[in-house]
Amino acid sequence: MTSVSECFQSLRDRKQCGLIPFITAGDPDLETTAKALRVLDASGADLIELGVPYSDPLADGPVIQAAASRALRRGVKLEDVLNIVKGVQGDIKAPIILFSYYNPIFYRGIEAFLEQIKSAGVKGLVVPDLPLEEAETLLKPAAEMGIEVTLLVAPTSPIERIKAIAHQSQGFIYLVSVTGVTGMRTQVATRVEDLLKSLRNTTDKPIGVGFGISEPEHALQVKNWGSDAVIVGSACVKRLAQGTPEEGLKAVGEFCQRLKQAIQ
């Protein structure tokens, strides 16, 4: 399993747009999550975002909130999530990026949290509610441990703030395509194209676009606008939760293949 930066460099060398599916750990259950990581990897995922269930997920829309609630009701904890990551080491090529809110990190202690996720094999970290002003407290120790912390750029951010975020973000820059929470939308905001151009003038770091991408044609549109990767969350979580675990795995695998075909 390579680092996040190495994966993006490989994509760039091959002139390819990356696919980053997101799933919530523990939904519908831990065993299915482990299988889903393998299925996504085999179905074209270049990197995989794995969400740690949290009781107050402010950035998440109804689909991911519901998945997190189901996982929490089953008693899923960070340790369970990391055991899954450990269990798939050697089976998958795609680096795993952990998606966690800041409170569980702060509660455990930054150093202890980072040591835990590093030993499990996590390569990257996205913390949606991490303020830029406090980012250094996490970025510095994470970098020393080889974990890349990716920061989010909101479409409403002033240009100076965008520059500051782009400068500090590690691995890639996570461009939020819409204001508000994650979720499936019928179209991708055309403002994303302008934001991508603005970011390109600011940094040469890879850019991944997420929030609101729910169809292969959305992924292709974002790729054509110049994104280095497309991030698809709610649409994957919804499919994985459909029917039996076996049906969910089949649905999310086929969807991932369709997304990959669209951007190749």
Curated annotation (Swiss-Prot):
It comes from Crocosphaera subtropica (strain ATCC 51142 / BH68). SUPFAM superfamilies: Ribulose-phoshate binding barrel. It is an enzyme of class 4 (lyase). PROSITE patterns: TRP_SYNTHASE_ALPHA. Pathway: Amino-acid biosynthesis; L-tryptophan biosynthesis; L-tryptophan from chorismate: step 5/5. GO terms for molecular function: tryptophan synthase activity. PANTHER family: TRYPTOPHAN SYNTHASE ALPHA CHAIN, CHLOROPLASTIC, TRYPTOPHAN SYNTHASE, ALPHA CHAIN. Its EC number is 4.2.1.20. This is Tryptophan synthase alpha chain. It catalyses: (1S,2R)-1-C-(indol-3-yl)glycerol 3-phosphate + L-serine = D-glyceraldehyde 3-phosphate + L-tryptophan + H2O.
